[in-house]
Amino acid sequence: MTDAPTLTTDVAIIGAGPAGLFAAFECGMLKLDSLLIDALDCVGGQCAALYPEKPIYDIPGHPAIAGAALIEGLEQQIAPFDVPRLLGRRVERLSGHRGAFTLGTDRGETIHARAVIIAAGAGAFGPNRPPLAGLDGFEATGAVQYYVRRRADFAGTRIVIAGGGDSAIDWALALKDEAEKIWLVHRRDRFRAAPESLRQLDEAVAAGRIEKIVPYQLHGLRGTDGALEGVEVATLDGDTRILPADRLLPFFGLSTDLGPIAHWGMDSIRSTIPVVPSSCETTLPGVFAVGDVAAYPGKLKLILQGFSEGAMAAHAIHPIVRPDTALHFEYSTSKGVPDRI
């Protein structure tokens, strides 16, 4: 058995979602080397794991772009810097101080870094599962799913989508032309989503492409051997209906956990890490946080804000790694992409 490797880098980036990938790009633009570490076995974070085919509408310059396409573009952007990755690894330990950190993974690797960027999204995440009898068996066959990776997998199916927020409505709209039938179940009469999504939902309901079932909530599953034959829904008054569906997609949000990160000595609040807005530095000097995990007054949990935070963190890190080199701000149109580090 060989010893696990020891790696050295300027900046260790924990999390390889959009914010982490762009932080690696910004480090490269400042001629800082970086290393990406992620618990998933691929880069992309939630964009890759949860909605690779779901269109994203608020990325500047892209009227609509799928999660997978966004990640592909970010990978192309960092390609000139040949950023190494440790995928399928969880960072368990962090020790040291500003300018000299040591990180340890659950696979035994040791990483020495001058600074650390935490781009861990909401940390480890998983779906909030509905409390339904026999749920495990239907999950095992794929009759109940919490993520849509390929819309084509739902062609010709009868789908119950449960939830009242953006995810439920977005997927109802995205699947309405694939599915034979879609029921959208919500325990309240009103949905909470972007105004444009609500407008499109009203159009789809009027056209008969989606049927709203309100105010109902999930009550039971019908079927044998993991084959779903119907979803039972009920009102608070006890009125029940059976919807003859063969797929159930519950969208009740994600449960999140920072895991070991919460025990590294920096402040944390409900799976987020407070940072200085101008630099994204945490209360642990030399450790920065960007993307959804970063918290400060006025924070918007948008991908594009994570991009901005990655740039701010990289610029704040430069004097830590290159204390004797002055950093003169330049536009990328002027300096281009630096040669590989």
Swiss-Prot record:
Q: Which domain of life is it from?
A: Bacteria
Note describing how the cofactor binds: Binds 1 FAD per subunit.
Q: Please report the name of this protein according to its UniProt entry.
A: Ferredoxin--NADP reductase
Q: Which Pfam families match?
A: Pyr_redox_2
Give the EC number: 1.18.1.2
Which cofactor(s) does the record list? FAD
Organism expressing this protein natively? Gluconacetobacter diazotrophicus (strain ATCC 49037 / DSM 5601 / CCUG 37298 / CIP 103539 / LMG 7603 / PAl5)
Note the PANTHER family from the entry.
THIOREDOXIN REDUCTASE 1-RELATED-RELATED
Q: How does it assemble?
A: Homodimer.
Q: Which HAMAP family match?
A: FENR2
